[in-house]
Amino acid sequence: MTTTPSALKTSSLVLPTQVADGIWKKTVDGSVLARLAKRRPQKFGEVKQMTLTGTPRAELVGEGENKGPSEIGFGDKTVVPRKLQVTVRVTDEVRWADADYKLGVWDEIEDANAKALARALDLIGIHKINPLTGNVATTISEGVIDCDNTVTLAGGKYDEALESAIGLVLANGYAPDGIALDPMYSYSIAMMRDNDNRKLYPEMGFGQGEVSFNGLKGLTGTTVSGKPEIAAASNLLAIAGYWDAFRWGVQREIRAELIEYGDPDGLGDLKRKNQVAIRSEIVYGVGIMDLDAFALGDGAGIGDAGIGQVDVEEPADESDVRA
């Protein structure tokens, strides 16, 4: 059931005589795309990126021989501006409580808004969804999720599926330089063991944050699967890719704006309701140069085993045991 957002009230806060600095919050991971793909400077508006569609070849020329032509082709892809915003309301009483008790409410709201906008880059760039509703946005025509290179994760063979995804990127002529993983999928790989209970991938640690899979950089984040924002489960648990093919930049950014008048979000006049609003906005420029630079790990085939349920497989003989 959809609920109407309401303003933050002092009843939601703890106001003892002495309050420890800061407010505890659940850590929300940011954007995996922003960490894997290089941010590029952009001006506002659509940005045309030239792409090479034909690769010239060198010709061996003998003494006195004529030189032949080499073919080359160019195309273009468009980086499209995507505007996102977060608007939250608080009551006047919250402002007073924050001033008196030094709760750090304003800093916390600004930080939470920034994290929401960071996650939004992945949610539009990978899943093409409106983060607020969780539904696919009709205004976004292309996302990483549209990639046709897909490997189905089956049973407990999490590592083999990821290796296959990396192989698909290589087969398309790209050198994969990173992987994005759902945290529980990464954890499942990290917990894989041989029949002597030795970890197969000790470099994965517990599979959280920044990891390494056979020397390839990996980053974990819940935005890979789209949870919790996405309305319809995507089953996406891993992305292998050559990340220069995902182009993004920040065209305009408003860190935090205090709004004291009007009706900025359709919930009624602020002064009439004794409220203020805090709004954060950003305009991303987002474009994918070639979907073939990516491969997806689809968790639809995992079945009853489930992510996190790692079985230890007996090798055929001792030579099959990985140290």
Which residues does each PLM region occupy?
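Extended oligomerization regions of viral-like shell subunits
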Residues: 151-269, 276, 282, 311-314, ...
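Short amphipathic
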Residues: 85-90, 280
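Short loop/turn segments at secondary-structure transitions that flank enzyme active sites
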Residues: 55, 94, 119, 185-187, ...
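Assembly/oligomerization interface modules of large self-assembling protein complexes
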Residues: 6-86, 293
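Short conserved micro-motifs at the rims of enzyme active sites and ligand-binding pockets
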Residues: 60-62, 100, 190-194, 228-232, ...
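Alpha-helical scaffold segments that mediate packing/assembly in large oligomeric complexes
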Residues: 89-172, 296, 308-322
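Protruding loop/beta-arch "assembly-hinge" segments enriched in small, turn-prone residues
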Residues: 1-28, 265-323
